[in-house]
Structures are given as structure tokens and as C-alpha cells.
Amino acid sequence: RDSTLNDLYYTLRVLELMPELRLCADLSHFVVDREFREPLCERDQSYIRTILEHSDCIQGRIANREQVQVQIDFPQHQAWVEIFKDWWRLGIALWRARSHNDATLRFLCALGPPSYAITDARGEELSDRWQEALTIRSWVETIWQQLESKPGVTL
């Protein structure tokens, strides 16, 4: 965040030049940076896959093309919730495929305070970040268990 690797195209270029570079996949900033539209095109999906192939850490926050952090239970954000869950599933599966059995994947529920979070006219958050973090954690634990029950999943 707030760095040279905040720009998706620049980051992809850096990865071409330094393929050994490991990242923390903060995908929400790429969604806003490139103003991704849903449904996502194949090109954008391939860009995110490249980021995930080079990531040893994943940040858990859901964005849409206008906002880097959206409420996960609002109906208008459900398409993005599913997109991010699919990306997390892919990122975790890719990480598991290249990591040793005793390795640790870091998944950080990175939910920021106001003004990162969406607020009302009084500056109060519209959601409960702690509860959202617990929900995201539960989703990721389920994804992990699903992948664990299907070893060797083809990506």
C-alpha cells in the first residue's frame, strides 16, 4: 500500500524482471487501481493469478472498482465477495502446491478504520470490522479445509 507495487501493471513488470520476488497479495488495491469490472475478463483474471503465483501472504479485504474496502454483507457487494473468495481459494491452492508441509501461510484480515471503512454522515462505520474479520476468517478456514480434503487439486 502507498508504494511502487500498488500499481498492478508496474508490479507485473517487476515480477517479469525479478521472478523470485515474493509478495503479500493485497488484491483490493489492484481492483481499485485498474477499476476492474465484474464479470472479470480473462486478462484481469490472469493478472491476479500471476500476483498469487508470487505471493506467500494474502490480505483479506474485499474491494470493488470504486472502494478499497466494502461491507461484506451488503447485497450489492456479493459478486465481489465471491470473486475475492475465489481468488483466496486460488492463492491458497497455489501456495500449498509450492510450499513444504511445515510452512505457514499468512492470511491477514486487513480491515482498515475510518476513513478506510465506509462511514455515514457522522463518520461512523456502517459495519462491524471485528465481526467482518471473523466472517472472513471462517471463509478462509473453510477454503483451507476444502483444499485439504482434495489434495492435488488441479488449478
What are these regions (language model features)?
Residues L17-L21, V31-L155:
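Histidine-acidic metal/acid-base catalytic patches
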Residues D26:
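Active-site glycine-centered loops adjacent to acidic/histidine catalytic or metal-binding residues
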